[in-house]
Amino acid sequence: MVSRCTHARIASVNTSRNPGLLWPGNEEIVQDTGTNAVYLDHAATTPLRTEALEAMIPYFTEVFGNPSSIHTLGQEARRALESAREVVSKVLECRASEVVFTGGGTESDNAAIRGGAFALKQAGNHIVTTEVEHHAVLHTCHQLENFGFEVTYVPVDSDGLVDPEAVAAAVTDKTVIVSVMYVNNEIGTVQPIREISNLVRERAEAIGRTILIHTDAVQAAGYLNLSVKELGVDMLSLSAHKFHGPKGVGILYIKRGTPLVPLLMGGGQERERRSGTENIAGIVGTATALKLSEEERESTSIHCRELRDRIIAAIPELIPGTLLNGHPIKRLDNNVNVCFPGLEAEPVLLGLDLKGIFASSGSACSTASLEPSHVLTAIGRPADIARGSLRITVGRETTDGDVDYFLETVQSVVQRLRELPSFRLHNR
């Protein structure tokens, strides 16, 4: 069993009735249980590790100098910054000079794709990506289309896997960037990045092109190998709060010699790749969390995989008609994504929330949208079913008891909702 993270479980949650969250017939669902919270939304964010917090505190109150200052306090901050960069470089198996700290995963994706596209615009105006990327990639590509770039969105199969041959086949003599995510943030499908990079390199060599390869690896940290040598990429994005680090800090690996126009202009920090005074406390916490996540990767993966497999096996037995989204095997160790046909996600999530269980319907970056998940529609789910997806993502601190309570509760919530007249009328 993986040791529990002391900040992972909220001590108590007020699950008393909220009139604004009631709907006819759910009175039994929303009764106050008085239980501790069960957090099952680790794909959205993770609790800050105690070790990371403790490492950060001195840089808020004592070593608060600007790392660009030449005085002693500034140089102490500079040493902390470069030490953190070394830690990250060891995990990524790259040079420290190739590590750039950003404000988060979204900024890292934007900097990689926009920066690479504009740097190579004279050579070509074509980008290749997939239909199931995070919005930080998709919306960036959509915007670049307004600047004269052409984008090919390669489809995926019913499990969310992209065919590496299809990615390579999409490359033309105008292609400048290929961006494929390492792990899908909604359904957990793991893409064959090494195979994709090999085929794209071969294709680029055959047509005499320089093509940059980027992967959004935000969901992979702590579960999969992040070696850029093994992955064969030119750029890789990470976000600290996905691996028990602080919010507001990202990482962008940029291979030496990669042409890139900076997204942010200013004082030329981060070797002129990302201007702006560095967030030293956040960066120190990020390096601490990433190092520990890598050291514990095997044990965390085993622990989470066992819990994940329990949930995947149990839910269809408890709730007939359940559909599993994502690849049954090639998926992240902590991810479960299911649909309950005939039910939308919101009432299920509210029912769980009012019992002290926190999950989500998909990407936390777009949960306010009424549109069905673009990922689920890309794998062939009809819009009405896609709107009913439930994403459960366990973590290093999740226990067997948490899973027991979740399974018991989700069965009760779904059963109660299916007994409502509105459900029976809708599904006649």
Regions picked out by a protein language model, each given a short descriptive name:
Residues R4-C5, I10-N14, N18-R428:
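Pyridoxal 5′-phosphate
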